[in-house]
């Protein structure tokens, strides 16, 4: 039986401008699907996405849940579209406060949003709640981009008893792109949810910046990939020190190396 891979991407072209992250957000799921694996793909519904041009539409049966972050209700809206020239369907996580009326991770003046940490938390919980509703059980969950970095932590704590994710292995791709600002003093308390308890956050700095977020992702991942050159050496060293399986940058022709890494993390069993 073909492996099932859930891709949780920060960016995917053509919905947002071409960057290393958005290109990888398209190319990796496409190559994995072409290799015969079953996939699902998620990204935030950034405010700069043209819904009409991208032919996004809301999925009513998946929308409407309220996610509470810092004692405030935020409504989860799910939209979906298909990437032209491919059979890839993309699910978008949307919310009026966090995404619809914003740009991406920075505003129109280039300033990073102060609540980017909360946005990452909402995105993580939104994805996981939606996958549960889809009744689709992934074997591998591959997180690309720091906006998805909370997901490994939640999978191994708050969602560890969920049948949907019980047997899944988590892979985190580290990129050189990183925010300059930290995620605010409240991040460590905001991320607490169900079994994702505050005691698990005690070992991380109160000034929760990109490196701390990266360490959090690594600590709860089953494998880590160096997705391009220039990844923070502190994070690669952290993965090595924690003895988390690490795939060093395999070059631009990456698919064979990624497929072998998937097999290492989640070996195929004979039916």
Which residues does each predicted region cover?
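Catalytic cores of nucleotide-sugar-dependent glycosyltransferases that transfer UDP/GDP/TDP-activated
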Residues: 1-271
